[in-house]
């Protein structure tokens, strides 16, 4: 895992967009973002049990696996959105970027590769893309039935109950 400030320059979303300014993992924690490097399935199982994740599935994001809809899907994952549930991803193979909004509404880019697990709190604005290799295989963990419902950023999501709870939580974490 490597985290840094997104450079905001034009260009393919799958490029690194590295500003050269690193972000300390402690800052990610202040945003409510949790990171683990996991080397075995048993560690994933332990984390799932501890956090009450009951279901899981796997997704492969690649042109070979998704065919003609790959570019459309990658663009949809990159729309800024939030979820009303935690988003938990364990990278099984390949790599990709999660971008999360900072307290100042800037993007923090988090590069994840095989063995990295990230937990995004419900209500955080974020987006995802593969890196330039165009290949990410990930396990998705869920507390209940598997679902992935993005709520794209807008006035309505700014007032969303889960967004408001996240902002209160973030203020408490930063204190």
UniProtKB/Swiss-Prot annotation:
Question: What does the record give as the reaction this protein catalyses?
Answer: 1,2-dihydroxy-5-(methylsulfanyl)pent-1-en-3-one + O2 = 4-methylsulfanyl-2-oxobutanoate + formate + 2 H(+); 1,2-dihydroxy-5-(methylsulfanyl)pent-1-en-3-one + O2 = 3-(methylsulfanyl)propanoate + CO + formate + 2 H(+)
The record's listing under InterPro entries reads:
ARD, ARD_euk, RmlC-like_jellyroll, RmlC_Cupin_sf
List GO BP terms, alphabetically: L-methionine salvage from methylthioadenosine; methionine metabolic process
> Where does it reside?
Cytoplasm; Nucleus
Explain how, and how many, cofactor molecules are bound.
Answer: Binds either 1 Fe or Ni cation per monomer. Iron-binding promotes an acireductone dioxygenase reaction producing 2-keto-4-methylthiobutyrate, while nickel-binding promotes an acireductone dioxygenase reaction producing 3-(methylsulfanyl)propanoate.
Q: Where does Fe(2+) bind?
A: 81, 83, 87, 126
Q: Which UniProt keywords apply?
A: Amino-acid biosynthesis, Cytoplasm, Dioxygenase, Iron, Metal-binding, Methionine biosynthesis, Nickel, Nucleus, Oxidoreductase
Coiled coil feature spans:
none
Pathway given for this chain reads: Amino-acid biosynthesis; L-methionine biosynthesis via salvage pathway; L-methionine from S-methyl-5-thio-alpha-D-ribose 1-phosphate: step 5/6
- Indicate which residues the UniProt annotation says bind Ni(2+): 81, 83, 87, 126
- Entries under Pfam families matching the protein: ARD
Q: What is its EC number?
A: 1.13.11.54, 1.13.11.53
Enzyme class name: oxidoreductase
Q: Which GO terms describe its cellular component?
A: cytoplasm; nucleus
| GO molecular function terms listed in the Swiss-Prot or TrEMBL record | acireductone dioxygenase (Ni2+-requiring) activity; acireductone dioxygenase [iron(II)-requiring] activity; iron ion binding; nickel cation binding
Free-text function comment from the UniProt entry: Catalyzes 2 different reactions between oxygen and the acireductone 1,2-dihydroxy-3-keto-5-methylthiopentene (DHK-MTPene) depending upon the metal bound in the active site. Fe-containing acireductone dioxygenase (Fe-ARD) produces formate and 2-keto-4-methylthiobutyrate (KMTB), the alpha-ketoacid precursor of methionine in the methionine recycle pathway. Ni-containing acireductone dioxygenase (Ni-ARD) produces methylthiopropionate, carbon monoxide and formate, and does not lie on the methionine recycle pathway.
Q: Which family does it belong to?
A: Belongs to the acireductone dioxygenase (ARD) family.
Protein name, as recorded: Acireductone dioxygenase
Q: Which organism is it from?
A: Phaeosphaeria nodorum (strain SN15 / ATCC MYA-4574 / FGSC 10173)
Origin organism lineage: Eukaryota, Fungi, Dikarya, Ascomycota, Pezizomycotina
């Amino acid at each position: 895992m490597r985290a840094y400030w997104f450079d905001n320059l034009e260009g393919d979303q799958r490029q690194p967009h590295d500003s050269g300014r690193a972000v300390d993992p402690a800052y990610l924690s202040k945003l409510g973002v949790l990171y683990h490097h996991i080397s075995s399935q048993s560690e994933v199982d332990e984390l799932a049990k501890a956090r009450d994740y009951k279901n899981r599935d796997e997704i492969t994001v690649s042109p070979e696996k998704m065919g003609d809809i790959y570019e459309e899907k990658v663009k949809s994952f990159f729309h800024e959105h939030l979820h009303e549930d935690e988003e938990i991803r364990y990278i099984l193979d390949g790599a990709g970027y999660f971008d999360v909004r900072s307290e100042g509404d800037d993007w923090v880019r988090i590069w994840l590769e095989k063995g990295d697990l990230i937990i995004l709190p419900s209500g955080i604005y974020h987006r995802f893309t593969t890196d330039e290799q165009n290949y990410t295989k990930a396990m998705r963990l869920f507390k209940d039935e598997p679902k992935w419902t993005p709520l794209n950023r807008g006035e309505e999501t700014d007032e969303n109950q889960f967004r408001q709870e996240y902002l209160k939580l973030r203020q408490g974490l930063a204190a």
